Design a protein with these regions (language model features):
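Helix-loop-helix hairpins and the membrane-proximal interhelical loops
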Residues: 1-60, 140, 191-295, 380, ...
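Short helix-coil transition sites and intra-membrane helix breaks within transmembrane domains
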Residues: 32-42, 80-90, 124-127, 262-272, ...
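Membrane-interface alpha-helices at helix entry/exit sites of multi-pass transporters
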Residues: 58-62, 99-116, 286-298, 326-329, ...
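Re-entrant/interfacial helical elements at transmembrane boundaries that shape
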Residues: 41-51, 79-99, 130, 173-174, ...
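A structural-propensity feature for long, helix-poor, extended segments
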Residues: 68-79, 86, 295-320, 324, ...
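Transmembrane alpha-helix interface/packing and boundary motifs in multi-pass membrane proteins
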Residues: 27-41, 70-83, 158-163, 256-266, ...
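Membrane-embedded alpha-helical segments of transport systems
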Residues: 69-74, 115-127, 135, 179, ...
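Membrane-embedded alpha-helical modules
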Residues: 111-228, 337-492
Length: 499
């Protein structure tokens, strides 16, 4: 049951000049990062987390969530005016946004994207508030067996949905698990793979890894393909009429549901949500032949869904400790940095955590709406900044942010090393999110597996006799078998022979 008094208390707790300024700062930075092709929301969040060290956790979450929401929306700017999606989530927006801009309706397209992004985030935030306590109740029945399988399920889901192939995704995920074993064993106190280096006693700095994998790797990749400054089209800002917004409302509600549900599926992401919603609307439209030629319904479907995906992705992150996408994988690192352990026991640390997240999402959405409407022309100017200047700024922030956490030059070396690793992974087709998930969930998987074995006298039987554990195990086996091309071909051949 929703506690209205807790919602009111959560609202009053953020009504200070400092926190409202953090909302503005995070949203503004997010929209700018999202608008610049080549700079991702994941990179922005990973850089930001290091600068939240020393803040109160509520202030840090305000900054992070604001940047996440602003960044997801910001990708529509370059998608509409340049036909270059600022983020993968805005790729579907470009299909109809850019043709509208070519007709001189770029401002209208941007206005539609702004209002629909706001609607999608608000609608999904309400679903987040309703669904989260239900999943928490389920999570309270978890034991060591379920936690271990949940960690493995998250890694396998991410490997399946973010990599070119399941095998490559699993290689990346298990590499992350191997990296997570470096340091002192939390149970026995034995040093593992430290090679006498005291800086490795606690393993690698998670912030250094995140900034290296997502920030430095992106810088290296971008330096390999530098392009001239972008020149956005000029377009007058035109707000959609009330009649137009009411016409789009049914599409927006349906797309919000698609985005929220898709976001709650671990490893899927806003880009998938946008494409699924776009395809549904194209099929339901009375004029599907106009999609891709400047039909505003395409923008409504894509932008509502990809922004609704943001609150949706927080559901598995907070309730089960499994990231909904690459950005929430990084956000988990930020929560851990501030002493919050995502998962079923999170409410024991902070009983009102879901109400506070709900309020932060709502307020961040309002700031996104205001910034999107009033700073349209400024963000168009940002697109013209030379990419070399942006990359220099990102590099400096990466070094400063990494060093600031522990004041160790060793962490800078780790950041650079993982930046090179991240770049090489891109070149061979290995996805970064499974690696990051492996590192984040590695400790949880290892400790709970060992506890499960000890408590069951080293018997594997509880994995199949406990209902939730059995369900997770069946899901894992299904994913692995479903992606095995050899077995799939044999199954189809067997069915054909029987037919």
């Amino acid at each position: 049951m929703i506690d209205l008094s807790s919602i009111v208390d959560s609202f009053t707790s953020i009504l200070s000049i400092k926190i409202l300024f953090l909302f503005l700062l995070g949203t503004f930075a997010g929209i700018a990062i999202g608008a610049l092709p080549g700079l991702t929301t994941t990179m922005g969040v990973s850089l930001l987390i290091s600068f939240t060290w020393g803040m109160e956790w509520i202030e840090a979450i305000v900054l992070i969530v604001s940047l996440h929401i602003g960044g997801t929306y910001g990708g529509s700017t370059s998608a509409i005016f340049l036909n270059i999606p600022g983020t993968p989530a805005s790729a579907a927006t470009a299909l109809d946004g850019y043709p509208m801009a070519q007709r001189g309706e770029g401002g209208l397209a941007r206005g539609i994207a702004t209002f629909q992004s706001f609607l999608g985030t608000i609608f999904a935030a309400i679903l987040f508030l309703v669904a989260s306590p239900l999943l928490i109740d389920l999570g309270m029945n978890f034991g060591s067996w379920e936690y271990f399988l949940l960690a493995m399920f998250g890694i396998i889901i991410s490997a399946n949905l973010t990599a070119e192939s399941l095998v490559k995704g699993l290689i990346s995920g298990f590499l992350g698990l191997a990296i997570a074993t470096i340091g002192m064993d939390k149970i026995t106190g034995v040093q593992r793979f430290t090679f006498g280096e005291s800086a490795l006693m606690d393993g690698f700095s998670l912030i250094a890894i995140l900034i290296g994998i997502f920030g430095i790797a992106e810088v290296i990749d971008s330096l390999m393909q530098l392009k001239p400054p972008l020149k956005p089209e000029n377009s007058k800002s035109v707000l959609p009429t009330w009649k137009m917004l009411m016409k789009f409302l049914p599409i927006g509600i349906r797309s919000s549901g698609v985005g929220a549900i898709t976001g709650a599926i671990p490893g899927v992401g806003a880009d998938v949500a946008a494409w699924v919603s776009y395809d549904i609307q194209r099929r339901k439209s009375k004029s599907p032949e106009t999609f891709g030629k400047g039909n505003p319904e395409g923008i409504v479907a894509a932008e509502t869904a990809n922004n609704a995906c943001v609150p949706g992705s927080y559901v598995p992150m907070l309730t089960l400790g499994i990231p909904g996408d690459a950005v929430t994988a990084v956000i988990i690192g930020g929560l851990l940095l501030h002493g919050l352990q995502p998962g079923p026991l999170l409410t024991t640390q902070n009983p009102d955590i879901f109400y506070q997240f709900f309020v932060i999402i709502i307020v961040a959405s309002v700031f996104m709406l205001v910034c999107g409407l009033f700073f349209t022309f400024l963000f168009q100017k940002v697109l013209a900044v030379p990419k070399s200047v942006i990359l220099l700024i990102v590099t400096v922030l990466s070094v400063v942010g990494t060093f600031a956490v522990n004041n160790r030059t060793f962490d800078i070396a780790v950041m650079i090393a993982f930046g090179i690793v991240g770049f090489m992974m891109r070149k061979v087709g290995l996805a970064a999110p499974p690696l990051v998930l492996g590192i984040i969930l590695g400790l949880m998987a290892e400790q709970n597996f060992r506890r499960a074995m000890v408590s069951a006298d080293y018997s594997f039987l509880p994995f199949v006799t406990r209902p939730i554990s059995l369900f997770l195990l069946v899901c894992i086996i299904f994913i692995l078998l479903n992606q095995n091309q050899f077995l799939t071909k044999q199954f189809r051949r067997l069915r054909k022979n029987k037919g």
